[in-house]
């Protein structure tokens, strides 16, 4: 179902800047037992994105209530929230927009993640690099053409997910997930100050590992860094964390970090 500006409907104004320019941001949350997992973190992500994009959205309490209400109706599955600058005007200027648009939708949970958790995911290198833009890096904005192309190429392989580099050749993320790899007690994840999305589960994992014996390091690393890894994981808010079993000729069977994180990520609140 769709909830647009508080009303159940599936019609959006054709001059909304979400469709005209991808002028907005979004977040995708996991719903379990009628509750939005990490609700406050999702709201904080949207608020931070709106501030950076200069979208004057102010109805945060209303949005939180709508997310909570839809989750209670959905019980289990996925809740997506989109915020756009709104409708009005023409051209790139958003000065004619005075009311941001909020769109909430629900859907079933992805079924394939259960298999990935049991067997481990397989990765393939994407030929599509991410452009480097420090102003937009980290944001889950509505401009997702890179991911559309990455996904299109991935569907031509037998892999489950894509390893994605930025235009300088640094490991950045997967198509729809963040990346971690472990070498002994050191846990590495790509820096996201130039490209990529700072995912909700990435943030949660880094927070949970901070007081442990594991040392979390954000790095600029080449693809070859994975050859030294004892273990590789991918994560997003829906998975929420999955072990990687193979990339090209490299295979990983260790599950130490995964076994530690899995129960924490399944019930993060």
Language model feature labels by segment:
Residues 1-68, 72-73, 84, 89, ...:
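Helix-start/capping segments and mature chain N-termini
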Residues 78-83:
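ATP-grasp fold ATP-binding core
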């Amino acid at each position: 179902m769709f909830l647009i500006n508080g009303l159940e409907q599936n019609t959006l104004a054709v001059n909304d800047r979400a469709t005209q320019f991808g002028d907005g941001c979004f977040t995708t949350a996991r719903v379990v037992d009628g509750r939005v997992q990490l609700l406050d973190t999702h709201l904080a992500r949207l608020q931070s994105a709106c501030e950076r994009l200069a979208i004057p959205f102010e109805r945060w309490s209303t949005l939180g209530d709508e997310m909570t209400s839809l989750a209670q109706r959905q019980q289990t599955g996925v809740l997506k929230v989109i915020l756009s600058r709104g409708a009005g005007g023409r051209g790139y200027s958003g000065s004619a927009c005075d009311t941001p648009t909020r769109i909430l939708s629900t859907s079933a949970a992805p079924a394939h993640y259960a298999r990935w958790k049991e067997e481990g995911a397989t990765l393939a290198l994407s030929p599509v690099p991410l452009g480097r833009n420090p102003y937009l890096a980290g944001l889950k904005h509505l401009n997702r053409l890179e991911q559309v192309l990455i996904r299109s190429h991935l569907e031509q392989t037998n892999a489950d997910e894509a390893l994605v580099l930025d235009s300088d050749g640094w490991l950045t993320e997967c198509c729809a997930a963040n990346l971690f790899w472990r070498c002994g007690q050191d846990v590495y994840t790509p820096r996201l100050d130039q490209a990529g999305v700072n995912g909700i589960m990435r943030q949660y994992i880094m927070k949970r590992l901070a007081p442990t014996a594991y040392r979390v390091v954000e790095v600029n690393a080449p693809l070859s860094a994975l050859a030294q890894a004892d273990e590789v994981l991918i994560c997003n808010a829906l998975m929420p964390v999955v072990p990687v079993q193979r990339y090209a000729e490299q295979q990983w069977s260790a599950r130490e970090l995964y076994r530690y994180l899995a129960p924490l990520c399944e019930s993060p609140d």
